């Protein structure tokens, strides 16, 4: 039997040269001399970690400003509905979790894409004649964020590009660029309730475009696209043969004066990966259960995209099994009154905030129709001491102890985002402080003195 022997000088602890001797057919010969590795510590971060950049963290962490010690801090910046304790999930939801835990059935590993029974429940919950679903069309994930990550990873290669909204959720860029995927920004129009500039969107598409990301209802805008507008978006995607990643984590979280339309119900020709989860509608973001719904009635994705999602899901071996065990009861037993009460509160707060901020000179809020947010334009010409929205919001913290996210975090300068999940009394106080702040810093723009005198 042939043998391979590497001979070293045992007297040298760190040899610089190795003799490689090969014994073939009983004959020994020196095949070559290999250079050894000079041992030294050289641990460096990976390219992926160096490419990973979260605009919100980069901006907020550099806002080294202390709030006014004489005023209680009011945070309108955190998109977590549980922070203030005024929006608990329904008792049926927590009981479902307790029952799943007490059963002892869900302490082990599940398939990486989730239990079959849990995927069947999600498919049944979202199935409709216009967009039929089966368990094989559902991938369970660790929150909606991981659902988005898997969709980007399965659709795009390094060097390709994706189209994302401006303003838009910063995670899209963070994930894409860490994978070497280029990001192209399409514009949302505040004067049209944040509808997409469709002409500009289509101009961005080229042979390297891997997918179009559509977030509806929107974070940070609180906008909800009409059926007609969604059909126009789908027409662009169909014309250009670009699949859609639909971020629908706020699906059904729309106010009573408008209707939510899942994108997949409006097209049989465009393949759509819809991302959702429990976080927002059920008010449990920390439970980290999301899903991908695969809508592909023309079999454009074929088996390859489905298989790719399964393979990618195996990197973390699936989401929390206890939440999966509770999923059937959560989806079947949560009363409609819970959803209605949540939306009633959000709409009331949105109306209150919009009305109060609309009356403040220098601010231009855009009325929301759903989700948990409201965007406010700053007429910077009336606040000349501030260079941009970041400085404006920094001073708002320092003087009034009110935290709002500058919309530069969402690629949209000279706006700021307000979270409308805070208790009503806190919202009233925050709006009052914002008014006081603006009145103290407002200056008439050149040529508008007559308006200021009114």
Swiss-Prot record:
Catalytic reaction(s) noted: L-tyrosine + 2-oxoglutarate = 3-(4-hydroxyphenyl)pyruvate + L-glutamate
Cofactor: pyridoxal 5'-phosphate
GO molecular function: amino acid binding; identical protein binding; L-tyrosine-2-oxoglutarate transaminase activity; pyridoxal phosphate binding
Cited Pfam families: Aminotran_1_2, TAT_ubiq
pH dependence: Optimum pH is 7.
Gene3D superfamilies, A to Z: Aspartate Aminotransferase, domain 1, Type I PLP-dependent aspartate aminotransferase-like (Major domain)
Domain of life: Eukaryota
EC number annotated for this UniProt entry: 2.6.1.5
Entry function: Transaminase involved in tyrosine breakdown. Converts tyrosine to p-hydroxyphenylpyruvate. Can catalyze the reverse reaction, using glutamic acid, with 2-oxoglutarate as cosubstrate (in vitro). Has much lower affinity and transaminase activity for phenylalanine.
Species for this entry: Mus musculus (Mouse)
Modified residues (Phosphoserine): 448
UniProt family annotation: Belongs to the class-I pyridoxal-phosphate-dependent aminotransferase family.
GO-annotated biological processes: 2-oxoglutarate metabolic process; biosynthetic process; glutamate metabolic process; L-phenylalanine catabolic process; response to dexamethasone; response to mercury ion; response to oxidative stress; tyrosine catabolic process
The protein's name in its UniProt record: Tyrosine aminotransferase
Gene, per the UniProt record: Tat
PROSITE patterns: AA_TRANSFER_CLASS_1
Transmembrane segments: none
Temperature dependence comment: Optimum temperature is 55-70 degrees Celsius.
Cellular component aspect of the GO annotation: mitochondrion
CDD domains: AAT_like
Subunit structure: Homodimer.
EC class (word): transferase
Entry keywords, A to Z: Acetylation, Aminotransferase, Phenylalanine catabolism, Phosphoprotein, Pyridoxal phosphate, Transferase, Tyrosine catabolism
Parts forming coiled coils: none
Sites bearing N6-(pyridoxal phosphate)lysine, chain numbering: 280
Post-translational modification N-acetylmethionine, affected residues: 1
